[in-house]
């Protein structure tokens, strides 16, 4: 890797790290009277980090599986164009739209 790629990779890592730290701190830190975490806070942070890392790993696996399909779905497009035009496929097809006749509601003024 060249230097620019190393810097970009470091920047991405630090962004993920900072986001993870902020989420877990906001979710777990409750006692600001001490300079160390309480036992409950430490446990919460550990569970939070484990959960976030698991979610990140699952997300990356799905991304690694789906990205090539999206990139080369349309063979005539370049990978950049394919990414821009790729739309996520809905899990459930949308129902057919059917016209519905409506009857206007007339409100009576009661005085």
From Swiss-Prot:
Annotated segments matching region Disordered: 73-111
Keywords tagged on the record: Disulfide bond, Membrane, Metal-binding, Mitochondrion, Mitochondrion inner membrane, Protein transport, Translocation, Transport, Zinc
Gene Ontology CC terms: mitochondrial inner membrane; mitochondrion
Positions of disulphide bridges: 24-48, 28-44
Topology term for the membrane: Peripheral membrane protein
Motif Twin CX3C motif positions after renumbering to this chain: 24-48
Principal location class: mitochondrion
GO process terms (BP): inductive cell migration; protein transport; regulation of multicellular organism growth
Signal sequence extent: none
Compositional bias segments (type: Low complexity): 94-105
Subunit structure: Component of the TIM22 complex, whose core is composed of tim-22, associated with peripheral protein tin-9.2/tim-10b and the 70 kDa heterohexamer. In most cases, the 70 kDa complex is composed of TIMM9 and TIMM10.
Entry note about domains: The twin CX3C motif contains 4 conserved Cys residues that form 2 disulfide bonds in the mitochondrial intermembrane space. However, during the transit of tin-9.2/tim-10b from the cytoplasm into the mitochondrion, the Cys residues probably coordinate zinc, thereby preventing folding and allowing its transfer across the mitochondrial outer membrane.
Function statement: Component of the TIM22 complex, a complex that mediates the import and insertion of multi-pass transmembrane proteins into the mitochondrial inner membrane. The TIM22 complex forms a twin-pore translocase that uses the membrane potential as the external driving force. In the TIM22 complex, it may act as a docking point for the soluble 70 kDa complex that guides the target proteins in transit through the aqueous mitochondrial intermembrane space.
Protein name (record): Mitochondrial import inner membrane translocase subunit Tim10B
Phylogenetic placement of the source organism: Eukaryota, Metazoa, Ecdysozoa, Nematoda, Chromadorea
């Amino acid at each position: 890797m060249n230097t620019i790629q190393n810097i970009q990779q470091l920047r991405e890592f630090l962004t993920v790290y900072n986001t993870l730290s902020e989420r877990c701190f906001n979710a777990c830190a409750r006692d600001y009277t001490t300079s160390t975490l309480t036992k409950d806070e430490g446990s919460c942070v550990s569970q939070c980090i484990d959960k976030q890392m698991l979610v990140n790993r699952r997300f990356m696996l799905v991304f690694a599986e789906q990205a090539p399909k999206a990139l080369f779905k349309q063979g005539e497009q370049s990978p950049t164009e394919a990414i821009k035009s790729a739309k996520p496929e809905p899990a459930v097809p949308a129902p057919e739209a059917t016209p519905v006749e409506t009857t206007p509601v007339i409100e009576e003024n009661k005085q």
